[in-house]
């Protein structure tokens, strides 16, 4: 029983959805002014809903991608490929989790959050995984919006008040996703070519790929400091965020100068925790 639970848990790709849950929880926390019992319960509701939705989406996309997962070295050990989980069971598991994520929000009358949840799941499962992943090199741009929705789901689970802050955080996630995915895809471009998945990095030259990825990193930095100019964050936040971004910007320049897998890996390694660090900064400066 325990091994089966562990198998299905791993099937949902926790390394992927854990960051989505993290940014969603941050989105919920920055929306409140004080930690009352009601607010804590609302944060818990947001956390559970986002976790179930993210797990369900990843499980369902695993079902959709099972044929190409069998071709790619990086993914050929996933449960549907190895036969540890039957495809139909994997599909139902994902659909049930996604359904529960929306039902929970509706049960607690968090209608706007439920709408954003439905849109995010649709974008991830249908727009990205089913419709565009195998058809266009810009698939991650069209499907990347789903990654930003946990922030606004978290925010609008605890409050109905409008603010520019959650939408800036939403934009940060959406901009960060191509950097993260493309820099990883650049390293595994042979895998994507073998599976006939037209990722931007697998069909463009090394130079163009490096420019696209590095430009995204620069845009990410710019967006990370924009909240200051809307008075959503203090100037001290901008100073700290700029200092933290320097290594990422340096690696971006080096990647453009010498586009190879080693440079791509360095950018991937640093940009991976960058988003989480920025969100922690937002949380800290929110309550300072």
Curated annotation (Swiss-Prot):
Carbon 2 of the heme B porphyrin ring is defined according to the Fischer nomenclature. It is an enzyme of class 2 (transferase). One of its GO terms (biological process) is heme O biosynthetic process. It comes from Thermoplasma volcanium (strain ATCC 51530 / DSM 4299 / JCM 9571 / NBRC 15438 / GSS1). It catalyses: heme b + (2E,6E)-farnesyl diphosphate + H2O = Fe(II)-heme o + diphosphate. It is found in: Cell membrane. It comes from the Archaea. The keyword Iron does not apply. Converts heme B (protoheme IX) to heme O by substitution of the vinyl group on carbon 2 of heme B porphyrin ring with a hydroxyethyl farnesyl side group. NCBIfam families: cyoE_ctaB, PRK04375.1-2. The chain crosses the membrane at residues 16-36, 37-57, 88-108, 111-131, 138-158, 162-182, 210-230, 236-256, 265-285. It is a multi-pass membrane protein. Its EC number is 2.5.1.141. Keywords: Cell membrane, Heme biosynthesis, Membrane, Transferase, Transmembrane, Transmembrane helix. CDD domains: PT_UbiA_Cox10. Its main location: membrane. One of its GO terms (molecular function) is protoheme IX farnesyltransferase activity. The keyword Lipid metabolism does not apply. Belongs to the UbiA prenyltransferase family. Protoheme IX farnesyltransferase subfamily. Pathway: Porphyrin-containing compound metabolism; heme O biosynthesis; heme O from protoheme: step 1/1. GO terms for cellular component: plasma membrane. This is Protoheme IX farnesyltransferase.
